[in-house]
């Protein structure tokens, strides 16, 4: 969503620094921090509320919330928590990332039958009282260097489980950092940068 917002602003499709984007996961409200030279320095997105209800994720475990549940993935026991952040997310909190092969465990868990619509899988390590390192396996796409909804879901779960008590949390993904603010009833605001890395043209 941040990359899309940057694209439409940079290409003058949208000329205001505040606008909304209608997505399959609802309407997202964007605010751009524009620098002195007219370039975007930061983007803030209202991601709406996290949905903790298991039936809405959807997850077939018959509990109100899917928090710190245990499942066997391959031959390894996995403890995970899950929410709907526009799309399904399962987060595994680890002490060290070498506890799991992110690609193997992520691929298997994406398709496990308790998630009838499949799930994104996040591996998260709390490194400070306001900081989380995260690696993400995205459903249908595989390993990704960054996932905005995954960062939002993981920050909300860390807060809900008491792993982090602060309302402003830094997420360190492999592709960069995001800042997540947790508001009333777990309404989430995501802030971060977006950078253009290349331009291309489709030829007929």
Region roles according to the model:
Residues 2-145, 155-204:
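Active-site proximal loop and beta-alpha junction motif in alpha/beta enzyme cores
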């Amino acid at each position: 969503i941040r990359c899309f917002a940057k694209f439409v602003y940079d290409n003058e499709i949208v000329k205001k620094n505040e606008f909304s984007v209608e997505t399959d996961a609802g309407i997202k409200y964007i605010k751009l921090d524009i620098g002195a030279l007219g370039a975007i320095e930061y983007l803030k997105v209202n991601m709406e509320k996290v949905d903790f209800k298991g039936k809405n994720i959807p997850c077939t475990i018959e509990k109100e919330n899917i928090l710190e549940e245990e499942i066997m993935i391959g031959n390894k026991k996995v403890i995970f928590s899950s929410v709907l952040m526009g799309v399904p997310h399962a987060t595994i909190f680890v002490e060290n990332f070498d506890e799991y092969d992110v690609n193997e465990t992520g691929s298997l868990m994406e398709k496990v039958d308790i998630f009838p619509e499949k799930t994104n899988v996040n591996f998260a390590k709390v490194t400070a009282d306001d900081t989380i390192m995260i690696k993400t396996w995205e459903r249908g796409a595989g390993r990704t260097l960054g996932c905005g909804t995954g960062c939002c879901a993981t920050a909300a779960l860390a807060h809900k489980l008491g792993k982090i008590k602060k309302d402003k949390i830094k997420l360190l993904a492999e592709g960069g950092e995001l800042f997540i603010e947790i508001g009333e009833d777990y309404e989430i605001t995501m802030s971060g940068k977006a950078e253009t890395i290349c331009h291309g043209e489709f030829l007929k």
